[in-house]
């Protein structure tokens, strides 16, 4: 590759004097960004790596805390490939809370999958950080127990595993110790070997220690000449007030562009396909409004309980854990107007418009439940309060159903029903779109009195057995006139034999690239909490007793009354 030079113009004398007199920087250095765009080696589109060539300066925030100035330049502006010399940068990924279940079951396997697919830079390292005392080898043994060759069952990937594990290291330290993060910084620098260093921190830890870790990492272990980004796991607070305080504290050390708030449901294949289905198919786009859609249902169910994690779950409950984030994010994607472009900010701005068009959830539009012990098939299933980590008289809901409305021209009057619960009869997540009845309905008699059987329904199954199917009415072959419902379906496992990437793979890759489309912006988070906080406070202040439902059932009866209040029948009732 030919060598290209870049000329940085000198500032004018007037601007120079201003910088000297009033600049908050400890030293004034020219800064410029460079980026590389090249085709990915896998099913993903492109990998973009952004670097910064000069040493960073320190910028004091309003509270006097230093912020990594180089990473503030992480704007995504790109130059051409010719300005980048191959191999001049390195990527350091630090998983904070590396000994936890999320890291073992999701994050490390996702990083290995990206490595296997050739989506990580040539020069990268992975560090685990936690309080647990481990050696490098012990971390590698822990990681290797969770890695599989699921990406391509025909190929043994033992060699790839070994190569990946050699890039994995461990550092033990306290989450609030600047000294321990300074030691981590030394180890990162050893692996980076003087190259331009880009650093990604994944906070797989409880939210009450987010700020301590961000403070220590920002002050002691930020990149000095590249970008620094931080992935933050939900929950993002418990209500509007705590969420706002968490954001304010994080922004003492990070800019909004450095914070990647992850909701792994946004990385799921069918959720990402939602906008493609709508905006690239003329058959659906004209129907996507109150004129043709009768109701929309967002359903989430798990066929297991808290399984010993009740102590953690009891602090939040099902509304905060699932409804306020996963289901509301899907709702916003489903209902948003056509964005100006596929740029992250354009998409996120349209989602915010949807959330701001909604009225806060009313207590009369919420049903809460809690699973109780149940004997089935000779087996005893424990109730929620039977979990030893849960208080005996806990009122925390493990099930919730809610009706919400969007007050705009497209969706006025259309009920958006949400349902989420633990210890139900099945595991799944899906979006159900029930269309209006055909005007006149010539074949009404063929369906007797149950007009719900005549309703067209679009179902997008997020998990398991990902698929899309459209329920239509057709004539049963024969001499008589008998109608039946049939499914036009796209089952992913039948149509696409290739393994579907895990949501964490896509989201980690996007964070490395600086692609923010599937991450949550602070104003989006604020708008989401504003919708749920009033009802959550009422539930807790009035000590609303949840309706009990047996472990393994379809949930409390109250959910059906809520649906019928808006002339809706839950679409999943007819399925096993």
UniProtKB/Swiss-Prot annotation:
It is found in: Plastid, Chloroplast stroma; Peroxisome. Disulfide bonds join 149-157. GO terms for biological process: glucose metabolic process; pentose-phosphate shunt, oxidative branch. The active site is at residue 326. The keyword Manganese does not apply. GO terms for cellular component: chloroplast; chloroplast stroma; peroxisome. NADP(+) 2 binds at residues 419, 432, 461, 469-471, 554. GO terms for molecular function: glucose-6-phosphate dehydrogenase activity; NADP binding. NADP(+) 1 binds at residues 97-104, 131, 234. Keywords: Carbohydrate metabolism, Chloroplast, Disulfide bond, Glucose metabolism, NADP, Oxidoreductase, Peroxisome, Plastid, Transit peptide. Changing residue 157 to S: No effect on the interaction with G6PD4. It is an enzyme of class 1 (oxidoreductase). Its EC number is 1.1.1.49. Pathway: Carbohydrate degradation; pentose phosphate pathway; D-ribulose 5-phosphate from D-glucose 6-phosphate (oxidative stage): step 1/3. Expressed in leaves, stems, buds, flowers and siliques. Optimum pH is 8.0. D-glucose 6-phosphate binds at residues 234, 264-268, 302, 321, 422, 427, 463. Residues 1-50 form a transit peptide. It comes from the Eukaryota. Catalyzes the rate-limiting step of the oxidative pentose-phosphate pathway, which represents a route for the dissimilation of carbohydrates besides glycolysis. The main function of this enzyme is to provide reducing power (NADPH) and pentose phosphates for fatty acid and nucleic acid synthesis which are involved in membrane synthesis and cell division. Belongs to the glucose-6-phosphate dehydrogenase family. NCBIfam families: zwf. There are 6 glucose-6-phosphate 1-dehydrogenase genes in A.thaliana. Forms homodimer. Interacts with G6PD2, G6PD3 and G6PD4. This is Glucose-6-phosphate 1-dehydrogenase 1, chloroplastic.
């Amino acid at each position: 590759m030919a060598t290209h030079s870049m000329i940085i113009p000198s500032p004018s004398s007037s601007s120079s004097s201003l910088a000297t007199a009033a600049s908050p920087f400890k030293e004034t250095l020219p800064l410029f960004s460079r980026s590389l765009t090249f085709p990915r080696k896998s099913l993903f589109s492109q990998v973009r790596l952004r670097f910064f060539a000069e040493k960073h300066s320190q910028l004091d925030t309003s509270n006097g805390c230093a912020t990594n100035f180089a990473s503030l330049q992480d704007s995504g502006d790109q130059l051409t490939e010719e300005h980048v010399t191959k191999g001049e940068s390195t990527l350091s990924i630090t998983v904070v809370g590396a000994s936890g279940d999320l890291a073992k079951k999701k994050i490390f396997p996702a990083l290995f999958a990206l490595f296997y697919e050739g989506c990580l830079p040539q020069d990268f390292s992975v560090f685990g950080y936690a309080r647990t005392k481990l050696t490098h080898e012990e971390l590698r043994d822990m990681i290797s127990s969770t890695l599989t060759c699921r990406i391509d069952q025909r190929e043994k990937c033992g060699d790839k595993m070994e190569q990946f594990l050699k890039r994995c290291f461990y550092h033990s330290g306290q989450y609030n110790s600047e000294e321990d993060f300074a030691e981590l910084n030394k180890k990162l620098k050893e692996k980076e070997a003087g190259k331009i260093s880009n650093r990604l921190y994944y906070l797989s830890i409880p939210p009450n220690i987010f700020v301590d870790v961000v403070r220590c990492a920002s002050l002691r272990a930020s990149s000095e000449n590249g970008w620094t980004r931080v992935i933050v796991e939900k929950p993002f607070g418990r209500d509007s007030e705590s969420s706002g305080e968490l954001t304010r504290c994080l922004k003492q050390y990070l800019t909004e562009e450095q914070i990647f708030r992850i909701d792994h449901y946004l990385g799921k294949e069918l959720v990402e396909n939602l906008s493609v289905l709508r905006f690239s198919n003329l058959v659906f786009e004209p129907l996507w409004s109150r004129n043709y859609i009768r109701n929309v249902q967002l359903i989430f169910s798990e066929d297991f309980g808290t399984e010993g994690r009740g102590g953690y779950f009891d602090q939040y409950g099902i509304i905060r854990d699932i409804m306020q984030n996963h289901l509301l994010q899907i709702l916003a994607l489903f209902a948003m107007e056509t964005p100006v472009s596929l740029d992250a900010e354009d998409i996120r701005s349209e989602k915010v418009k949807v959330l701001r068009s909604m009225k806060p959830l009313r207590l009369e539009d919420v049903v809460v439940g809690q699973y109780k012990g149940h004997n089935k098939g000779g087996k005893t299933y424990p109730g929620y309060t039977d979990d030893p980590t849960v208080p005996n008289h806990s009122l925390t809901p493990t099930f919730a159903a809610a009706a919400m409305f969007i007050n705009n021209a497209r969706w006025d009057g259309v009920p958006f029903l949400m349902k989420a619960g633990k210890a139900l009869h099945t595991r799944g997540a899906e979006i159900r779109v029930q269309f209006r009845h055909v005007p006149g309905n010539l074949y009404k008699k063929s369906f007797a009195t149950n007009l719900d059987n005549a309703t067209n329904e679009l179902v997008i199954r997020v998990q398991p057995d990902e698929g899309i199917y459209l329920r239509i009415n057709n004539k049963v072959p024969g001499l008589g006139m008998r109608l039946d419902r049939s499914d036009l379906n796209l089952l992913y496992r039948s149509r696409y034999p290739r393994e579907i990437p895990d949501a964490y793979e896509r989201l980690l890759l996007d964070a490395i690239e600086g692609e923010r489309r599937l991450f949550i912006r602070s104003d989006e988070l604020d708008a989401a909490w504003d919708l749920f906080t009033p009802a959550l406070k009422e539930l807790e202040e009035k000590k609303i007793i949840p309706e009990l439902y047996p472990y393994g059932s379809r949930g409390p009866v109250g959910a059906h009354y809520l649906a019928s209040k808006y002339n809706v029948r839950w679409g999943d009732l007819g399925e096993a």
